[in-house]
A protein has these predicted regions:
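Juxtamembrane regions of bacterial inner-membrane/periplasmic proteins
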Residues: 2-239
Length: 239
């Protein structure tokens, strides 16, 4: 009888653990759904308003504070009509040639990148689309991790569903990093070329587009070879 009592006494403990585990799982799912819904509201609001700041901008500010370095932010969002078509075309040619036709992910480009990485036996360029980069800038950080990629892959379809391609491009051109504390086309064109974004010529636009992959290290004046490659891509597309 004593043995039976011990067995019976052990069952409630197992049942309690299962209940707690179930509660944790349900709580985690509810939290994830709540965050997803909050992101959906934020993305929907971006149809009409520009973000006052972004996750990447906040990351840079915190990093500067922790390192005791000065931080000066230059961020002046402007409508797409005030951004030179030269820059719009240069950025699309450089970063996401199939931007207008895909739905957030460029599977063809991803396959090419994967094949190149396998051949080189190391990870190379990311192959992220403009939409993916926008999501990273708005909601995530510059840190590379599987968790960040997972969150990115859940948010990209939402952005594509709720925003037009023109609005996605407009937001992207206004929030991406173009140098230390320099965010967006207007700030970048004023800083590097001393003209508003609406007045950028083809060469200036190509040089700005060329530094996007590594904005804290590259300088437009040093991008002769890559900027020419971008100009060639633009010409092939009819831009």
């Amino acid at each position: 009888m004593a043995i039976k009592k011990r067995k019976a006494g052990g069952r409630p403990s197992v049942t309690k653990k299962k209940k707690w585990l179930r509660k944790i799982v349900i709580g985690g799912l509810l939290l994830a759904l709540s965050l997803y819904a909050l992101c959906a509201v934020c993305v929907l609001a971006l149809r009409w308003i520009n973000p006052p700041t972004t996750a990447v901008q906040m990351e840079r500010r915190v990093s500067a504070i922790l390192k005791g370095r000065p931080y000066h932010k230059h961020y002046d969002p402007v409508p797409l009509r005030r951004i030179s078509p030269n820059l719009q075309h240069a950025v699309v040619a450089a970063e996401d040639g199939r931007f207008r036709t895909h739905h957030g992910f460029d599977w063809i480009e991803m396959q090419k990148v994967l094949e190149q990485d396998i051949q080189r036996h190391k990870l190379g360029r990311g192959g992220s689309t403009i939409t993916q980069q926008l999501v990273k800038n708005l909601f995530l950080t510059t840190e590379r991790s599987l968790v960040r990629k997972g969150v990115e892959f859940t948010l990209v379809p939402m952005v594509e569903a709720l925003l037009t391609k023109d609005r996605i491009l407009e937001l992207y051109l206004n929030v991406i990093e173009w140098g230390p504390g320099i965010y967006g086309a207007e700030a970048a064109s004023e800083y590097y070329d001393h003209v508003p974004a609406s007045e950028l010529n083809r060469e200036q636009a190509a040089r700005l587009a060329a530094i996007i992959p590594s904005p804290l290290k590259r300088k437009p004046a040093q991008m002769n070879e890559y900027s020419q490659e971008i100009l060639d891509r633009m010409a092939k597309t009819g831009w």
